[in-house]
């Protein structure tokens, strides 16, 4: 009798673990009915980010503009990204990172899903696409890993219309990462980002410097190649009008 009870307990634990680890298939996702705008969403937790999948439809670009105005999205940013940022705004009046992220995803925004596990949201600053960003989220873990990648022009020697201009890359993870062993899926996504920009005849930057900003604000220098940068030859933007002096 004791053995039967032990087997039953083990079977229950295995079934519970499998259910918890399952990731919702975005192809089978049914979007919920529109919420009452007067109601505030509760702060999302690590286990309830499956609602993000709905914004990856329709493919191939999803609905980035709708995501940016979803209160749950801003709640995620405020909760997960508290690092100081130095890539945008005057030194004495820099906005919080959680406020800057949507700005870097505003224009030409797309949302894509990969391997039924990863979501990437990318875009650029309106009227100044030399400043652009990508938010990468791994939903395949109990506590999703999110990394915001920001690129901005280094205003020295070359204008943004020149392929020889240099850019900086910042990576902001929502939890501590080893700068020497970044997730392969993340660096692959960053490399694919440049490939998509090249295909769209938009700016492909030459990353001169890269840095990982830990959740506590500690900067960790990175080799740009180690972060997945510079896999595509740099090219100027030939499709998006912008002011090369903006920052």
Go through each PLM region and give its residues.
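Positively charged n-region of N-terminal signal peptides that target proteins for export
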Residues: 1-5
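Bacterial N-terminal signal peptides
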Residues: 7-16
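Sec/Tat signal peptide C-region and signal peptidase I cleavage site
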Residues: 17-21
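Exposed acidic/polar residues on beta-strands and adjacent loops within beta-sheet cores, strongest
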Residues: 22-247
